[in-house]
UniProtKB/Swiss-Prot annotation:
Keywords: Ribonucleoprotein, Ribosomal protein. The lineage of its organism: Bacteria, Pseudomonadati, Pseudomonadota, Gammaproteobacteria, Alteromonadales. It comes from Shewanella woodyi (strain ATCC 51908 / MS32). One of its GO terms (molecular function) is structural constituent of ribosome. This is Large ribosomal subunit protein bL35. Belongs to the bacterial ribosomal protein bL35 family.
């Protein structure tokens, strides 16, 4: 049986941890002037992928 391929786009965006998959939050790329400093600071924090999305991410990262 051939090796399963890793989805490289997913591999660059998510990291496997003991608690699930770590990801970066959205809304911090552009149009930042109207967002408050507090909002931007909170968006810098990493967060975990939602429980319902974990199986899909795990399928795309077979060796994670």
């Amino acid at each position: 049986m051939p090796k399963m391929k890793t989805d490289k786009g997913v591999a660059k965006r998510f990291k496997k941890t003991a608690n699930g998959f770590k990801r970066k939050q959205a809304h911090l790329r552009h149009i930042l002037t109207k967002k408050s400093t507090k909002r931007k600071r909170h968006l810098r924090a990493k967060c975990l992928v939602a429980k319902s999305d974990v199986p899909a991410i795990a399928r795309q990262l077979p060796y994670a």
